[in-house]
């Protein structure tokens, strides 16, 4: 297994990507970047959902000039997505951007790449090399005949060398493809070829439903091998949904220490409460919690508490009443009409306890 802790740590704003087992969740805005008010509003929504790094498109000078104003109003690192015009990268860096995403191959002649690298080095800003199966260099396509994992790695190594030759090493690399099997193979080979942090993603994955399934299949396979330091779920949907899916995916692998988990049973003929709507309501309620609380919503009062004994708190419904339980032990019976509200109160108490405990641990570590 490849271990994330063996990758080179790279600072992005106040975060470190690589060098540890934490995976950073990213997303990208859908607004016109020059519309500062709309862009900041969307980023605030992403922050609330749990996004840790956000990328904005910088297609023109208006967008580049907006970077400084956006930076002042947000709390997470900001990444500039640059194509073709190196001057936009320079303007974004001047505006206080935290990371630049470029493809050195389409920035132009060496002196242009050198100008971007020197500006980034001066400000301590990392560069993400974005390799994409759909836009590989002509000579690589001619060599391999079509996009291959080997071709993608060769492209990455070529671009890495351009930066390394300029004595620049604050590099993050992505190896994106819309073909799941190609992406898996490319990331596996990249993890063996260099120790720079890897940004995971399945590009052009599709709509909310199809894209979620496709991304989970591809990124799940990659994550299971211990590969990846940051990720974005790319969906043709509200970017907040990207963050929600990313958090759920990381939770599935035990890689999200700051997210709540819902356990709910499949419906069957024994259920006598509106389990589906209750589960959805509770899921929405815990979606923004930044603690690793496990909450269970079960429809059977006979087996429920025992089946979800790993849950910190939960309810098991029956006709007219429900059982409130903690760690598999029944705490009390509650009337059905206030069952969900009582559960929410218990969730708030446990979440506050967990947050206080984490703060205490943090203070101890800093002493």
UniProtKB/Swiss-Prot annotation:
> E.C. number, please?
1.17.7.3
Q: Name one Pfam family in it.
A: GcpE
* Biological or metabolic pathway of the protein: Isoprenoid biosynthesis; isopentenyl diphosphate biosynthesis via DXP pathway; isopentenyl diphosphate from 1-deoxy-D-xylulose 5-phosphate: step 5/6
> Where is [4Fe-4S] cluster bound in this sequence?
265, 268, 300, 307
Listed cofactors:
[4Fe-4S] cluster
Q: Which reaction does it catalyse?
A: (2E)-4-hydroxy-3-methylbut-2-enyl diphosphate + oxidized [flavodoxin] + H2O + 2 H(+) = 2-C-methyl-D-erythritol 2,4-cyclic diphosphate + reduced [flavodoxin]
- Family stated for the protein in its record: Belongs to the IspG family.
Q: What does this protein do?
A: Converts 2C-methyl-D-erythritol 2,4-cyclodiphosphate (ME-2,4cPP) into 1-hydroxy-2-methyl-2-(E)-butenyl 4-diphosphate.
Which PANTHER family does this UniProt record tie to the protein? 4-HYDROXY-3-METHYLBUT-2-EN-1-YL DIPHOSPHATE SYNTHASE, 4-HYDROXY-3-METHYLBUT-2-EN-1-YL DIPHOSPHATE SYNTHASE (FERREDOXIN), CHLOROPLASTIC
Q: What is this protein called?
A: 4-hydroxy-3-methylbut-2-en-1-yl diphosphate synthase (flavodoxin)
